[in-house]
């Protein structure tokens, strides 16, 4: 007798209400179909998602199918309803809180923050530590993003003769690293702020959904330069703000 396929077993177990066995069989069926049979992949992933299977396995499958162009509209709606909308209130609250902080911050010179609904990126939570960024214009998902990777990705201190200048730092961990490892101007007797250059205002604003700025701004070490504001680096704090650190 020919051995029954994992998919056939999964469907039969689902019919009988044997949820645990169906989840196991659908997990095997998904592995068998991966990258080859998108209709079966979707069937299996939906069952796992809706009946207590590993949600990450289902989530990864939804993303994979979407990227491969399979039922994109349906899958985007599914992922939005399941993963984004339950968290949108928190994302919006964090964004608006960070905007309020930057409006009061003396060294953020651009203030035309877009409405939350107009941001170019949406962040779909993946787990407690990571997100999937989604480009609204391109309708594409990027790679998983970890705001707090416990590592520094670059050398911020290549030129010690000038204040630190770093471009497009979107890691909470690295921002806190800079805050903690650059001494205040008052302590070193010269201008020693950390200059953060962001090359795209919309993208910078989008990341305010997932960053926590309050602990970064308290000591006023950071200077935010947006796009062509890079021409202001380094700022003469004595001439502009009346601060003499010598």
Q: What label would you give each PLM region?
A:
Residues 1-246:
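N-terminal donor/sugar-recognition subdomains of glycan-related enzymes
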């Amino acid at each position: 007798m020919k051995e029954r396929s994992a998919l056939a077993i999964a469907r039969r177990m689902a019919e009988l209400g044997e949820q645990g066995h169906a989840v196991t069989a659908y997990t095997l069926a998904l592995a068998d179909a991966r990258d080859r049979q998108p209709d079966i992949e979707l069937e299996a992933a939906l069952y796992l998602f809706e009946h207590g299977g590993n949600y990450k396995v289902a989530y990864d499958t939804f993303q994979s199918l979407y990227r491969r162009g399979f039922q994109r509209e349906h899958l985007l709606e599914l992922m939005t309803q399941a993963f984004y909308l339950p968290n949108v209130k928190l994302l919006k609250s964090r964004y608006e809180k960070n905007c309020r902080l930057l409006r009061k911050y003396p060294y953020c010179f651009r203030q035309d923050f877009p409405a939350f609904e107009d941001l170019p990126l949406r962040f779909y939570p993946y787990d407690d530590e990571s997100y999937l960024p989604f480009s609204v214009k391109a309708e594409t998902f990027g790679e998983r993003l970890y705001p707090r990777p416990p590592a520094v990705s670059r050398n911020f201190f290549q030129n010690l003769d000038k204040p630190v200048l770093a471009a497009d730092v979107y890691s909470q961990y690295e921002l806190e690293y800079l805050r903690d490892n650059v001494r205040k101007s008052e302590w070193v007797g010269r201008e020693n702020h950390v200059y953060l250059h962001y090359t795209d205002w919309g993208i910078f604003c989008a990341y305010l959904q997932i960053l926590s700025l309050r602990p970064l701004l308290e000591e006023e070490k950071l200077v935010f330069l947006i796009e062509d504001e890079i021409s202001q680096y380094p700022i003469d704090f004595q001439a502009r703000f009346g601060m003499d650190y010598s």
